[in-house]
């Protein structure tokens, strides 16, 4: 491939596309085109060749493609001195159009080329003020064109319809306007436009990158093409913050950071999500928000391969692997991996409950607790079990429920090895070993290991019996007692002994009965060493040592150590005889008396005298 090299002006390297040709380029090619053309223009601006005529060249080129080219960064105005002349950059004017271009590009709109014409008048004003009303070309004379940047293009033979091969060795005798008027427009057909663009622009891009970086920072050793970039880099190292907010006084090291910060005060949110319409004050926030719609999770944990939508979430997650807990509570010294967790924890010390239910006025320390509570009013149960279809208002409740299907019991007692499917059940069980009874009755100072037991106990003091039997009208303070009582009417005894087939109303009764077959007596008296198969029997026996008789007769004042003894004694005052013989109809006030009487009918004599062999009933 034959290459021809020539020293050209900005207009000579400008490429024009028709509207149809421009649409054929992908975004990456458009960006590359924009960056290189702007770089070429800036090289001319640095020598103040951005006269009105040259600016119109740039504008007409841009207008043909209906795109505005932006650097993406805002650079501070600087001055370059060549002899006695000062040349000011026009980056600020270019940046003023940057935001509008980004907005139109994001929304898919065509850029209005009338906006960029604002740049046209700026160069004329500068020429008048800095060159004593004389154009810079006249000031420099014949040396003017020696300052032109060497912009080389390599033309691919046979791929350009109307190539213009011009040398500007005699540029001093030809005016800029003449060069513009005599230069034919170069159009690129759709067949080879993309290939030519890549070849031309990439070559120029490489020249820019290969250019010597003459501005170096001694601290970091980093070099830059422009002194403005070096100045920005120095600000980062020095911690210099020269842009101050007029409202709150906060300072920033970049002007664009200050502009973003000001939106916090004004409430301006110029960036809008096309999916849901939500608006944001920063373009970065919009970018992160869009990932919620796309499901994109670009941040991946190297330890467990878990992915996240936000970099901050990945940073917090990494603390789990590292065990890092940088946030410490000043009250109790407890540490946390997240600052939000520390904030919530502090409310335990302050008692603050900032979240209030609008329905009932109840307050909560955590927002999640309020959300769960609110479902009690709405009846919402969004969490569903895939096994049985049961729904729950809390995700934790569903998680515990699933263990019923899987049989998982992850919580183990360190004392006896017993396992549980709920952490709360393990905590209650642990109190059996420690003897802890944190729930105290305010009426009688009695303590309990479970809150539910305390609630049941309180019903004794207030005499409340909310649960009523529909058969006989008898009331109970516990629903479990009502269920057991109902079995008396139905005759149902669902708990059956596998040894003898005897049935029981309650499971606890079956457990106690089973010890008669096994001979197990797990309850031992610490005073005399006597053992019992029931806990209630041990409690009754213990009163023999203490002399405690808590049950008192209201009629005669006699006291008893067992409730059953008081009930039996009370029948002497009332004359009640609830036990009736089915054979002869005789009634008795004690069950033991009925049992002895019943042997008269059966002839049973279970008691035998060992000395003489006499049997008695």
UniProtKB/Swiss-Prot annotation:
A zinc finger (C2H2-type) spans 215-237, 243-265, 271-293, 299-321, 327-349, 355-377, 383-405, 411-433, 439-461, 467-489, 495-517, 523-545, 551-573, 579-601. Its main location: nucleus. GO terms for molecular function: DNA-binding transcription factor activity, RNA polymerase II-specific; RNA polymerase II cis-regulatory region sequence-specific DNA binding; zinc ion binding. Residues 8-81 form the KRAB domain. The keyword Transcription applies. One of its GO terms (cellular component) is nucleus. SUPFAM superfamilies: beta-beta-alpha zinc fingers, KRAB domain (Kruppel-associated box). Keywords: DNA-binding, Metal-binding, Nucleus, Repeat, Transcription, Transcription regulation, Zinc, Zinc-finger. It is found in: Nucleus. Pfam families: KRAB, zf-C2H2, zf-C2H2_6. The keyword Iron-sulfur does not apply. PANTHER family: FI01424P, ZINC FINGER AND SCAN DOMAIN-CONTAINING. Belongs to the krueppel C2H2-type zinc-finger protein family. May be involved in transcriptional regulation. This is Zinc finger protein 813. It comes from Pongo abelii. The lineage of its organism: Eukaryota, Metazoa, Chordata, Craniata, Vertebrata.
